[in-house]
C-alpha cells in the first residue's frame, strides 16, 4: 500500500512520545481504503494520430468520442458527472487522479446531490497518467475505478498524458477511442463516432418538468435544462429562488408570465443543434420583459437567439484557473470553464455588448443587454470545484428577478394570490427520464437514445 510505503520511507527519529506517533500512524492507515481492480491491457487511440498503450481500470468495454483535456487540480467527481462532458473522453493532466476516492450520492436539504453534478457519470471515457487504487477521504465510499466500472465507463491509466495533451493542444480536439483487451485495427475508422453529430442535449435534458422549492421562497425562476449542473440549481435555491426546471425544447415563452425570471443552463455539444431552444428564447425576449441569465451553453443559445454566431474553439477551455476580465469594472476573476464553443463577439447586435473577455485567448466570456436585465457568461460562476470569484452574478441576477416581481405585483396586485396553473406541487422533485451515458459505442444506438 502507498500509505504503508510512506510511513516506512520516513526516517526513524527518537521521540519522547512513541505511543503518540504510533497512534497517528494507525489513525492515518485506518482512513486509507483499497479499491484495487483487476487490470487488463487497454489502448487509447487518436484518429489519424498517436496510439497509447496502458491498463484498464474501468468498465470492460470499447468506446469512442471526442478527446478533450482538463487541467483542473481537483473535482474529478464533479467533472465526470457534468452533463457538459457527455460524449467526450476526458483526459486529466494531473499526474495522479483518484486519491480521495468517490463520494456517495448523498443529497442536501433541497434534495440536490451534494457531491455530483448529475446522478450518473457523464463522460464517455477517462484517461489518466496514474490512478490511485488506495484512496482516503471521509466522504469516499468507492474508488474511481470501481465507480467507472459500475457506471459502465471505460478508463485507462499508465499512458503519457503530457504527450496526449500536447497533441490535442497543437492539433485540436480529436476523435479518439479506448479499447480494452484487444488491438486497434487502423482500418476500422467507422469505429470512431463523432458526438458532434449527435443531439447530446436531448439525451441529458429532463424529459418532463420538475420543481425544487426554496426554504424561504422569495421568487420563482424557470430553468431551461440543457444539461443543468446540480450546483447551479443549488446556487439559485439557496438564494431564495424556487425553481421549476423544463426540458430544453419547452416553449418557455408561453408560460413566462407565471415566473419572475428565466435561467438557461449549461449543456453538451454544438449549440446549433438546439435551434428550437434559440427560437423559444427569441420569442421570449419579444413578448416578455422577464430577467434572463444564461451560463455556458445557455450563453451560446442566448447569442443564437439574438442573431449572433458561435464558433468552435481549437481545443476548448476546460480548467478551474482561467482569468476573465469584467469589461464594465476592469476587475479580473479567476473562473471555472468547460466549453468547446464560444460566441463571436463581433456578431452581437447593437443593443448588446461584451460583458467578460478571456485574458488567455481573448475569446468572449459573457454578454449583457444595454437596457434590459438580460446577461450571460461562458464561464461557470457556480464552480464546483473551482473558484467562486464570480458567484456574485447569481446575486445580481436574483436582485433583478425580485425587482421584476415587485413591478409585476404593483401592476397586477392579485398576481401572487391567484392559484398557479402550473401545479408545481404535483411535479417531480428531480430529473425525469435521463439515462446514463451510453459511451458512444454505436452510432445507431446513440442516435436512437437521442
Swiss-Prot record:
PROSITE patterns: GATASE_TYPE_1. Keywords: Amino-acid biosynthesis, Arginine biosynthesis, ATP-binding, Glutamine amidotransferase, Ligase, Mitochondrion, Nucleotide-binding, Transit peptide. Pathway: Amino-acid biosynthesis; L-arginine biosynthesis; carbamoyl phosphate from bicarbonate: step 1/1. One of its GO terms (molecular function) is glutaminase activity. Its main location: mitochondrion. The keyword ATP-binding applies. Pfam families: CPSase_sm_chain (PF00988), GATase (PF00117). Signal peptide: none annotated. GO terms for cellular component: carbamoyl-phosphate synthase complex; mitochondrial matrix. InterPro entries: CarbamoylP_synth_ssu, CarbamoylP_synth_ssu_N, CarbP_synth_ssu_N_sf, Class_I_gatase-like, CPSase_GATase1, GATASE. It is an enzyme of class 6 (ligase). It catalyses: hydrogencarbonate + L-glutamine + 2 ATP + H2O = carbamoyl phosphate + L-glutamate + 2 ADP + phosphate + 2 H(+). Residues 220-407 form the Glutamine amidotransferase type-1 domain. CDD domains: GATase1_CPSase (cd01744). Residues 1-29 form a transit peptide. It is found in: Mitochondrion matrix. It comes from the Eukaryota. Its EC number is 6.3.5.5. GO terms for biological process: 'de novo' pyrimidine nucleobase biosynthetic process; glutamine metabolic process; L-arginine biosynthetic process; pyrimidine nucleotide biosynthetic process. The active site is at residues 296, 380, 382. Belongs to the CarA family. NCBIfam families: CPSaseIIsmall, PRK12838.1. PANTHER family: CARBAMOYL-PHOSPHATE SYNTHASE ARGININE-SPECIFIC SMALL CHAIN, CARBAMOYLTRANSFERASE FAMILY MEMBER. This is Carbamoyl phosphate synthase arginine-specific small chain. It comes from Aspergillus oryzae (strain ATCC 42149 / RIB 40). The lineage of its organism: Eukaryota, Fungi, Dikarya, Ascomycota, Pezizomycotina. The gene is cpa1.
Amino acid at each position: 500500500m502507498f500509505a504503508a510505503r510512506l510511513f516506512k520511507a520516513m526516517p526513524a527519529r527518537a521521540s519522547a512520545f512513541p505511543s503518540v506517533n504510533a497512534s497517528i500512524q494507525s489513525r492515518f492507515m485506518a482512513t486509507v481504503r483499497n479499491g484495487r481492480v483487476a487490470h487488463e491491457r487497454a489502448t487509447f487511440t487518436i484518429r489519424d494520430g498517436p496510439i497509447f498503450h496502458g491498463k484498464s481500470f474501468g468498465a470492460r468495454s470499447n468506446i469512442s468520442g471526442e478527446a478533450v483535456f482538463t487541467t483542473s487540480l481537483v473535482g474529478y467527481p464533479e467533472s465526470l458527472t457534468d452533463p457538459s462532458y457527455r460524449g467526450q473522453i476526458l483526459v486529466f493532466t494531473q499526474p495522479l487522479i483518484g486519491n480521495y476516492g468517490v463520494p456517495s450520492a448523498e443529497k442536501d436539504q433541497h434534495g440536490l446531490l451534494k457531491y455530483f453534478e448529475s446522478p450518473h457519470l457523464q463522460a464517455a471515457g477517462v484517461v489518466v497518467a496514474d490512478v490511485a487504487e488506495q484512496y482516503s477521504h471521509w466522504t469516499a465510499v468507492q474508488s474511481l475505478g470501481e465507480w467507472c466500472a459500475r457506471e459502465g465507463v471505460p478508463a485507462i491509466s499508465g499512458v503519457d498524458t503530457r504527450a496526449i495533451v500536447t497533441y490535442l493542444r497543437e492539433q485540436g480536439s480529436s476523435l479518439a477511442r479506448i479499447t480494452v483487451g484487444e488491438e486497434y485495427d487502423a482500418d476500422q475508422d467507422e469505429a470512431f463516432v463523432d458526438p458532434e453529430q449527435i443531439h447530446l442535449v436531448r439525451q441529458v435534458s429532463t424529459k418532463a418538468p420538475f420543481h425544487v422549492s426554496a426554504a424561504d421562497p422569495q421568487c420563482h425562476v424557470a430553468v431551461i435544462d440543457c444539461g443543468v449542473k446540480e450546483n447551479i440549481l443549488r446556487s439559485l435555491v439557496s438564494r431564495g429562488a424556487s425553481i421549476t426546471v423544463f426540458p430544453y425544447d419547452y416553449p418557455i415563452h408561453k408560460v413566462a408570465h407565471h415566473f419572475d425570471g428565466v435561467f438557461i443552463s449549461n449543456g453538451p455539444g454544438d449549440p446549433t443543434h438546439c435551434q428550437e431552444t434559440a427560437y423559444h428564447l427569441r420569442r421570449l425576449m419579444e413578448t416578455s420583459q422577464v430577467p434572463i441569465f444564461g451560463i455556458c451553453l445557455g450563453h451560446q443559445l442566448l447569442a443564437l437567439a439574438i442573431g449572433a454566431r458561435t464558433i468552435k474553439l481549437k481545443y476548448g477551455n476546460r480548467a478551474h484557473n482561467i482569468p476573465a476580465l469584467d469589461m464594465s469594472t476592469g476587475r479580473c476573476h479567476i473562473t471555472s470553464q468547460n466549453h468547446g464553443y464560444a460566441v463571436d463577439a463581433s456578431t452581437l447586435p447593437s443593443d448588446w455588448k461584451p460583458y467578460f473577455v478571456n485574458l488567455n485567448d481573448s475569446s468572449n466570456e459573457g454578454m449583457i443587454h444595454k437596457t434590459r436585465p438580460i446577461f450571460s457568461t461562458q464561464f461557470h460562476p457556480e464552480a464546483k470545484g473551482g473558484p467562486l470569484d464570480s458567484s456574485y452574478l447569481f446575486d445580481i441576477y436574483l436582485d433583478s428577478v425580485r425587482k421584476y416581481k415587485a413591478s409585476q405585483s404593483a401592476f397586477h396586485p392579485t398576481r401572487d394570490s391567484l392559484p398557479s396553473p402550473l401545479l408545481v406541487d404535483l411535479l417531480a422533485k428531480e430529473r425525469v427520464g435521463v439515462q446514463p451515458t451510453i459511451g458512444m459505442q454505436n452510432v445507431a444506438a446513440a442516435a436512437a437514445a437521442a
